[in-house]
């Protein structure tokens, strides 16, 4: 009789611990989901637009470009043949537009 009680107690203990951990995991998951939904509603559209904008994807200055495709360089840059240290390269590069 005593052995049966010990085994029953052990089974109940294991089930209690297992179910308790499952509840904690689901609570963390639901909290994470709520936080992600709140973040998406507050910042999601703005962040997605700003990350995907052409200016944010802009590689910047001294990046190879194709002179026949004006969209290779960002709006602040223009596709020019290199001068000075880069004259031996065959391709064009994005340089800052000259003011004036």
UniProtKB/Swiss-Prot annotation:
GO MF term set: calcium channel regulator activity; sodium channel inhibitor activity; toxin activity
Residues recorded with modification Serine amide: 99
Tissues/organs with expression: Expressed by the venom duct.
Signal peptide (from-to): 1-22
Cystine bridges: 58-74, 65-79, 73-94
Location within or outside the cell: Secreted
Keyword Secreted belongs to the record: yes
Propeptide residues according to the Swiss-Prot or TrEMBL record: 23-57
Gene Ontology CC terms, in alphabetical order: extracellular region
UniProt superkingdom: Eukaryota
Key words, A-Z: Amidation, Calcium channel impairing toxin, Disulfide bond, Ion channel impairing toxin, Secreted, Signal, Toxin, Voltage-gated calcium channel impairing toxin
Further remarks about this protein from its record: Negative results: does not show activity on Nav1.1/SCN1A, Nav1.5/SCN5A, Nav1.7/SCN9A, Cav1.2/CACNA1C, and Cav2.2/CACNA1B.
Known role: Inhibits 31.17% of Cav2.1/CACNA1A current at 1 uM concentration.
Domain notes: The presence of a 'disulfide through disulfide knot' structurally defines this protein as a knottin.
Family membership noted in the UniProt record: Belongs to the neurotoxin 14 (magi-1) family. 08 (Ltx-4) subfamily.
Protein name as catalogued: Omega toxin Ap2
Annotated source species: Acanthoscurria paulensis (Brazilian giant black tarantula spider)
Lineage start: Eukaryota, Metazoa, Ecdysozoa, Arthropoda, Chelicerata
């Amino acid at each position: 009789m005593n052995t049966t009680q010990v085994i029953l107690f052990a089974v109940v203990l294991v089930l209690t611990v297992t179910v308790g951990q499952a509840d904690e995991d689901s609570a963390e998951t639901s909290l994470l989901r709520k936080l992600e939904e709140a973040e998406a509603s507050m910042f999601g559209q703005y962040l997605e637009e700003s990350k995907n904008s052409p200016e944010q994807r802009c590689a910047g200055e001294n990046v190879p470009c194709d002179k026949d495709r004006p969209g290779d360089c960002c709006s602040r840059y223009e596709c020019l043949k290199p001068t000075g240290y880069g004259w031996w390269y065959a391709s064009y590069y994005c340089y800052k537009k000259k003011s004036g």
